[in-house]
From Swiss-Prot:
Binding site for Mg(2+): D78, D120, K121, E442
Keywords: 2Fe-2S, Amino-acid biosynthesis, Branched-chain amino acid biosynthesis, Iron, Iron-sulfur, Lyase, Magnesium, Metal-binding
Residues involved in [2Fe-2S] cluster binding: C119, C191
Name this polypeptide is given: Dihydroxy-acid dehydratase
Gene name as annotated: ilvD
PANTHER family assigned to the protein according to its UniProt record, in alphabetical order: D-XYLONATE DEHYDRATASE (PTHR43661), D-XYLONATE DEHYDRATASE YAGF-RELATED (PTHR43661:SF3)
Family stated for the protein in its record: Belongs to the IlvD/Edd family.
Length: 552
């Protein structure tokens, strides 16, 4: 076995001595050594309970006859990091997590690993590591938070963000805002809507690297603990059969993930993460592939922020496997693919029927005939931008308005709260891209403020930064090339007319090409905002959002 490198033979007596210093017996050392990669901490509500998940995983590993060895990786809470310099450090942790797992697994020569993430960048970071290291691996996340309630009204973290805007506009009282603060997040788990964390946890299931139920079983349910024990048992089987991520993460598996992403109306951040994961196994997911899948895949779910349902509702309606079953009825999935269950996709989903068609629409009665995410292009975004079409108000599907240009999310947030944004405006936030930010911050505070003050159905927002999975509205992110690389977004001036046409997938700056070129030529050289530390190194190595913001 792989771990024999560090434990077998007389010459490995020093290494065995070190294992014994931690209390491992000869029998434990002889067994397969399984890394339990935990992202537990006391900072992130989605991770506060992962110690229990890890204990269940380790119990499963021991039941199956192997030896678990746990180590931890970092995890950032995007909600706490939102709206200040901390958000620059969110996306960049994806690479830190992947790199640190690679280092630990290669240094200690584990036979397999169980990955325990839950929140936004930790899930893709761990999946990138699994693809890169390519030893038997399975992912078991911490599960979604339950939705909050105030009386008979359901709420979530996004309700609080939007409540800030509503309070500033005089639409709710301080007591109302405090009630949201107290009740929106009732306990542990990843935030309860179809935001980035839950989207990625669902897609881990679809890719075949997590067991059915991983994306939707609520964090507080005993079923989550049982699933963790099953994951621990299953990794030993994967090691025995030498089934690796490269056997599972095929082109067809990524096409399945994109199809389910479109059906769920998932987070725009998946358009960064799936290409980055695919890149590790030599697969290029370009934006044209994403649009082609969106064009043929119906949108079956409208979960928060696009609708009123939450992940717990999706779970009780049949979960991700039921959504996949619906898609399979029109041949929209590849069914003969390997998964960590030891069964094919088709075998996994054959009995997964929808239990509530109010939550998961039938395939012949979708919310729309095309997917929830769309890639748009035009002279403002030659290399593409992404919009969550399923969360766009109908009247903003096609829009023309004057640009209001800002250099940071904080500037926009302040302008919105001070009533300086008018109906019809097209907000442009630039120099927030992977290099320009650096770190490609999310713009949840500005978009939530727009919703709170009542402008979300009348104002569009365009940025080379990102959006939270909790964002709703006509919000176009990942504009590429970014402003820091002299993309056309750097040429926009206040008052320029911008045209949006989501159905035709266009984003147009109504300025002659010669004038755009002239404006870009006279721009001063971009000056990095951060000149030391990890952020500085990241800004030098990161590539365009159109590639998944991977590192050189």
């Amino acid at each position: 076995m792989r771990s024999d490198t560090v434990k077998k033979g007389f010459e490995k007596a020093p290494q065995r001595s070190l294992f014994k210093a931690m209390g491992y017996t000869d029998e434990e050392i002889r067994r397969p050594l399984i890394a339990v990669v935990n992202s537990w901490n006391e900072v992130v509500p989605g991770h506060i309970h992962l110690d229990r998940i890890a204990e269940a995983v380790k119990a499963g590993i021991r039941l199956a006859g192997a030896t678990p060895m746990e180590f931890n990786v970092i995890g950032v809470c995007d909600g706490i990091a939102m709206g200040h310099i901390g958000m620059k450090y969110s996306l960049i942790t994806r690479e830190l997590i992947a790199d640190s797992i690679e280092a630990m697994v290669m240094a200690h020569q584990f036979d397999g690993m169980v990955l325990i993430p839950n929140c936004d960048k930790i899930v893709p970071g761990m999946l990138i590591a699994a693809a890169r290291v390519n030893i038997p691996a399975i992912l078991i996340s911490g599960g979604p938070m339950l939705a909050g309630k105030i009386g008979d009204k359901v709420c979530d973290l996004n309700s609080v963000f939007e409540g800030v805007g509503a309070y500033s506009a005089g639409k709710i009282s301080e007591e109302d805002l405090y009630a949201l603060e107290e009740n929106a997040c009732p306990g542990c788990g990843s935030c309860s809507g179809m935001f980035t964390a839950n989207t990625m946890n669902c897609l881990s299931e679809v890719l075949g690297l997590a067991l059915p139920g991983n994306g939707t079983i609520p964090a507080v349910m005993a079923a989550r603990i049982r699933l963790a024990k099953m994951a621990g048992m299953k990794i030993v089987e994967l090691v025995e059969k030498d089934i690796k991520p490269s056997d599972i993460l095929t082109v067809e598996a990524f096409e399945n993930a994109l199809a389910v992403d479109m059906a769920l109306g998932g987070s725009t951040n998946t358009i960064l993460h799936l290409p980055a994961i695919a890149n590790e196994v030599g697969i290029k997911l370009n934006l044209d592939i994403i649009n082609a899948i969106s064009d043929r895949t119906p949108n079956l779910c409208k979960l928060s922020p696009a609708g009123q349902h939450h992940i717990e509702d999706l779970y009780f309606a049949g979960g991700v496997q039921a959504v996949m079953n619906e898609l399979s009825k029109k041949g929209l999935l590849h069914l003969n693919l390997m998964t960590v269950t030891g069964k094919t996709v088709g075998e996994n989903i054959k009995d997964a029927n929808v239990k509530n068609y109010n939550v998961i629409r039938p395939i012949d009665n979708p919310y729309s005939e095309t997917g929830g995410l769309v890639i748009v292009r035009g002279n403002l975004a030659p290399d593409g931008a992404v919009v969550k079409k399923s969360a766009v108000p109908p009247k903003l599907m096609k829009h023309r308005g004057p640009a209001r240009v800002f250099e940071s999310g904080e500037e926009v947030f302040e302008a919105i709260l001070k009533g300086k944004i008018q109906k019809g405006d097209v907000i442009v936030i630039r120099y927030e891209g992977p290099k320009g930010g650096p770190g490609m911050r999310e713009m949840l505070s500005p978009t939530s403020a727009l919703a709170g003050v009542g402008l979300i159905e009348d104002v569009a927002l365009i940025t080379d930064g990102r959006f939270s999975g909790a964002t709703r509205g006509a919000c176009f992110g990942h504009v590429s090339p970014e402003a820091a690389e002299r993309g056309p977004i750097a040429a926009v001036q206040d008052g320029d007319m911008i045209s949006i046409d989501i159905e035709n997938k266009t984003l147009t700056l109504e300025v002659p090409e010669e004038e755009i070129k002239r404006r870009l030529e006279i721009l001063p050289p971009f000056e990095p905002k951060v000149k030391k530390g990890y952020l500085y190194r990241y800004s030098k190595l990161v590539r365009s959002a159109s590639t998944g913001a991977i590192l050189e």
